[in-house]
Curated annotation (Swiss-Prot):
It is linked to Deafness, autosomal dominant, 70: A form of non-syndromic sensorineural hearing loss. Sensorineural deafness results from damage to the neural receptors of the inner ear, the nerve pathways to the brain, or the area of the brain that receives sound information. DFNA70 is characterized by slowly progressive, postlingual hearing impairment. This is DNA replication licensing factor MCM2. Belongs to the MCM family. A motif (Arginine finger) lies at residues 655-658. The gene is MCM2. GO terms for cellular component: chromatin; chromosome, telomeric region; cilium; CMG complex; cytoplasm; cytosol; intracellular membrane-bounded organelle; MCM complex. ADP binds at S530, Q531. Early fractionation of eukaryotic MCM proteins yielded a variety of dimeric, trimeric and tetrameric complexes with unclear biological significance. Specifically a MCM467 subcomplex is shown to have in vitro helicase activity which is inhibited by the MCM2 subunit. The MCM2-7 hexamer is the proposed physiological active complex. GO terms for molecular function: ATP binding; ATP hydrolysis activity; DNA binding; DNA helicase activity; DNA replication origin binding; enzyme binding; histone binding; single-stranded DNA binding. Phosphorylated on Ser-108 by ATR in proliferating cells. Ser-108 proliferation is increased by genotoxic agents. Ser-40 is mediated by the CDC7-DBF4 and CDC7-DBF4B complexes, while Ser-53 phosphorylation is only mediated by the CDC7-DBF4 complex. Phosphorylation by the CDC7-DBF4 complex during G1/S phase is required for the initiation of DNA replication. It comes from Homo sapiens. Residues 1-80, 109-167, 686-705 are annotated as: Disordered. The modification Phosphothreonine is found at T25, T39, T59. The lineage of its organism: Eukaryota, Metazoa, Chordata, Craniata, Vertebrata. A zinc finger (C4-type) spans 329-355.
């Protein structure tokens, strides 16, 4: 019985029916079992398990049954096909009759029926004890059900915001790429999800050294300003998630997309309604460790995250770029899309799914989503270009909220993806296929005073505030201007006032009054004029240096040119526009053409530049301080002529300068020797091989006690830079307590002297100049109001500037007239030394005229010095005779003879 049961079970399998051993067509001895075989058959559509069942169960049973069974082909073969009505009647119960219409099963119904039949056969097999559970069907069913179950668990975990252990167990070792490249690995679903969760966890849990949540504060600040950029420090990411930091430079496009999605989820978890402001959050990577030069970018940098720096030379306007585009079918008006537009290629539909037509299609303007697009060009910084090389440049693309983050003239640090794209013009020019390269910007950081103000620490602010309370802070700052240049105290004072600047005004919003102080240096060759300009370029937070010979009118202001590719007119900025909110330094100012010099009239007074060229009518800001250096006519300054006669400049230009500094190269044996000692000592101290003075940079060391050092210690150059930045940004002095009558009287006196001597004209601009200098002096002391000391210093600087431009014949009389103003904040010893030098010069002239030669020792009666000193209210000269200043200038006092001696 067991044998017959076994043979029946095997015969009813699909494999045997395919071999022709179907029990329905077998011998009459087995025909009685046809009904049972039909009811127990698993179905006609079962998958074949021929090889698998034979491999698992073996083939001994069926082979023995076939050998021992009856012969089907033989003499009695016809009897098997005779009609037997009783046995040929099928059971109608549960079966569909042949004459009935049977509906075709769907795929899901067929799969359900097959699953039910497999379950039935499995239970029947277990009941007979012949198959172990899961031998044939369970393994397949589990293989099919497990991905579905895991997929449902993943979706549930993603929706609930919970991390599923089973979901990430297969990619716990994320750095194991399993033979894939980084780009392929991070594009897979499993690693993408793991990176997504790790970065989200990093944003939620990263704290600084003080235990504060870093990104909670940054996200809060970002949402307050309605921005969509979240800055992530690469060093923080590398310290916490080193695997993500390793993947990021290799596959930046894929990683940044995952980071953006994770950041958006974190932001929406904190501020659920922030999606009304923006649907995208862009993660910006800063402080990438390796900085590449523009000229060092090569093929191996393609599609990698790089960091470089340069100066922005040009930029386009902000243009709309397709982000998610939809198309309309012109034949059936069906809306196709959305299609995600990438940077590398344009996505276009092939055919309409509604009417199957191949077009034409047009962009659906209403439903298409755009993003901001701007193209800039950055050029290598002048200081980083190798000797004998020209600066290289590279195009960069700014998207989203990065547009207008920089302007021409800004020095920036750019982090982005180095891409290549097709450029037809390059192929035409080179004759073979080449690709243009462009940097897709991810993060832009400017290097200007705004960044510097933000970088001032609390310790810096405390140090600056304490310095401002020093009574001699003004003298310290004046002495800190170009400390490696000997003498020229008046020039240093004027440049210091120009660096701090006054306060701009706009009464009623109708007329702008500039606050910048313009300075003109004029004098003999070899008097350090250009060195002063170079020093200002280094110490100023924003400076543009140019020369009169190499600068044209459009080079100083602005010019219009046609873009070589798009053929549209673009506006390019000149030196004055690039120096906005900074200093424009012009050397060899007298070498400029008159037409070029006329173009800066508007920029120096109204501080704007009007352009009307090629259909472009606009006005550009040029709010900068102009410091220029010029040589006199004939090469040397002639003191017997006025300033206007010595310099080839027109009166409109001269009147726009607030401070005029005349530098004369006079022969003075004592001063010449002191200058020579100073220069030699400076060379010795700053020689590269002198290791002892290696830490003293930019000549910020303490110089010997000389008259031009004001007798105080100069400030270090870094401290001076921070002091200037803080004062210009935070201090805005007012004029409420200013002595207006003193300024008015000084203006009337200067006008009268100007008309009498025929020197430079005094205009209303000089009143504004005095006010600006008073505000600058108040800003040096970090005062909120202009006091009398500030006005006196402004008058003194204005008078020195005015008197130095006079003829030598009227200079002495004017110094006597304005002696009480010129003596402000001067040390008595300095005044007495000045008077004594005048007496010595008169004695030298007398001896040359009488004896034809100069003696080694000059004697000046003490009575002459005492009389001169009484005129300026100085009665006690004993302190002057004992001072270091008196001895340094090689003077000695003979008490017996009451004579003052000077050795040459």
């Amino acid at each position: 019985m067991a044998e017959s049961s076994e043979s029946f079970t095997m015969a009813s399998s699909p494999a045997q029916r395919r071999r022709g051993n179907d029990p329905l067509t077998s011998s009459p001895g087995r025909s009685s079992r046809r009904t049972d075989a039909l009811t127990s058959s698993p179905g006609r559509d079962l998958p074949p398990f021929e090889d698998e069942s034979e491999g698992l169960l073996g083939t001994e049973g069926p082979l023995e049954e076939e050998e021992d069974g009856e012969e089907l082909i033989g003499d009695g073969m016809e009897r098997d096909y005779r009609a037997i009505p009783e046995l040929d009647a099928y059971e109608a119960e549960g079966l569909a009759l042949d004459d009935e219409d049977v509906e075709e099963l769907t795929a899901s119904q067929r799969e359900a029926a097959e699953r039910a039949m497999r379950q039935r056969d499995r239970e029947a097999g277990r009941g007979l004890g012949r198959m172990r559970r899961g031998l044939l069907y369970d393994s397949d069913e589990e293989d099919e059900e497990r991905p579905a179950r895991k997929r449902r668990q993943v979706e549930r975990a993603t929706e609930d915001g919970e991390e599923d252990e089973e979901m990430i167990e297969s990619i716990e070792n994320l750095e194991d790429l399993k033979g894939h490249s980084v780009r392929e690995w991070v594009s897979m679903a499993g690693p993408r999800l793991e990176i997504h969760h790790r970065f989200k966890n990093f944003l939620r849990t990263h704290v600084d050294s003080h235990g504060h949540n870093v990104f909670k504060e940054r996200i809060s600040d970002m949402c307050k300003e309605n921005r969509e950029s979240l800055v992530v420090n690469y060093e923080d990411l590398a310290a916490r998630e080193h695997v993500l930091a390793y993947f990021l430079p290799e596959a930046p496009a894929e990683l940044l997309q995952i980071f953006d999605e994770a950041a958006l989820e974190v932001v929406l978890a904190m501020y659920p309604k922030y999606d009304r402001i923006t649907n995208h959050i862009h993660v910006r990577i800063s402080h990438l460790p390796l900085v590449e030069e523009l000229r060092s970018l090569r093929q191996l940098h393609l599609n990698q995250l790089i960091r470089t720096s340069g100066v922005v030379t040009s930029c386009t306007g902000v243009l709309p770029q397709l982000s998610m585009v939809k198309y309309n079918c012109n034949k059936c008006n069906f809306v196709l899309g959305p299609f995600c537009q990438s940077q590398n290629q344009e996505v276009k539909p092939g055919s309409c799914p509604e009417c199957q037509s191949a077009g034409p299609f047009e962009v659906n303007m209403e439903e298409t989503i755009y993003q901001n697009y701007q193209r800039i060009r950055i050029q290598e910084s002048p200081g980083k270009v190798a000797a004998g090389r020209l600066p290289r440049s590279k195009d960069a693309i700014l998207l989203a909220d990065l547009v207008d983050s920089c302007k021409p003239g800004d020095e920036i640090e750019l982090t982005g993806i180095y891409h290549n794209n097709y450029d037809g013009s390059l192929n035409t020019a080179n004759g073979f296929p080449v690709f243009a390269t462009v940097i897709l910007a991810n993060h832009v950081a400017k290097k200007d005073n705004k960044v510097a103000v933000g970088e001032l620490t609390d310790e810096d602010v405390k140090m600056i505030t304490s310095l401002s309370k020093d009574q001699q802070i003004g003298e310290k700052i004046f002495a800190s201007i170009a400390p490696s240049i000997y003498g020229h105290e008046d020039i240093k004072r004027g440049l210091a006032l120009a660096l701090f600047g006054g306060e701009p005004k706009n009464p009623g919003g109708k007329h702008k009054v500039r606050g910048d102080i313009n300075v003109l240096l004029c004098g003999d060759p070899g008097t350090a004029k250009s060195q002063f300009l170079k020093y200002i370029e280094k110490v100023s937070s924003r400076a543009i240096f140019t020369t009169g010979q190499g600068a044209s009118a459009v080079g100083l202001t602005a010019y219009v040119q046609r873009h070589p590719v798009s053929r549209e007119w673009t506006l390019e900025a000149g030196a004055l526009v690039l120096a906005d909110r900074g200093v424009c330094l012009i050397d060899e100012f007298d070498k400029m053409n008159d037409q070029d010099r006329t173009s800066i009239h508007e920029a120096m007074e109204q501080q704007s530049i009007s352009i009307s060229k090629a259909g472009i009518v606009t006005s550009l800001q040029a709010r900068c301080t102009v410091i220029a250096a010029a040589n006199p006519i004939g090469g040397r300054y002639d003191p017997s002529l006025t300033f206007s006669e010595n310099v080839d400049l027109t009166e409109p230009i001269i009147s726009r300068f607030d401070i005029l500094c005349v530098v004369r190269d006079t022969v003075d044996p004592v001063q010449d020797e002191m200058l020579a000692r100073f220069v030699v000592g400076s060379h010795v101290r700053h020689h590269p091989s002198n290791k002892e003075e290696e830490g003293l940079a930019n000549g910020s060391a303490a110089e010997p006690a000389m008259p031009n050092t004001y007798g105080v210690e100069p400030l270090p150059q870094e401290v001076l830079k921070k002091y200037i930045i803080y004062a210009k940004e935070r201090v805005h002095p007012k004029l409420n307590q200013m002595d207006q009558d003193k300024v008015a009287k000084m203006y009337s006196d200067l006008r009268k002297e100007s008309m009498a001597t025929g020197s430079i004209p005094i205009t209303v601009r000089h009143i504004e100049s005095m006010i600006r200098m008073a505000e600058a002096h108040a800003r040096i002391h970090l005062r909120d109001y202009v006091i009398e000391d500030d006005v006196n210093m402004a008058i003194r600087v204005m008078l020195e500037s005015f008197i130095d431009t006079q003829k030598f014949s009227v200079m002495r009389s004017m110094r006597k007239t304005f002696a009480r103003y010129l003596s402000f904040r001067r040390d008595n010893n300095e005044l007495l030394l000045f008077i004594l030098k005048q007496l010595v010069a008169e004695q030298v002239t007398y001896q040359r005229n009488r004896f034809g030669a100069q003696q080694d020792t000059i004697e000046v009666p003490e009575k002459d010095l005492v009389d001169k000193a009484r005129q300026i209210n100085i009665h006690n000269l004993s302190a002057f005779y004992d001072s270091e200043l008196f001895r340094m200038n090689k003077f000695s006092h003979d008490l017996k003879r009451k004579m003052i001696l000077q050795q040459f």
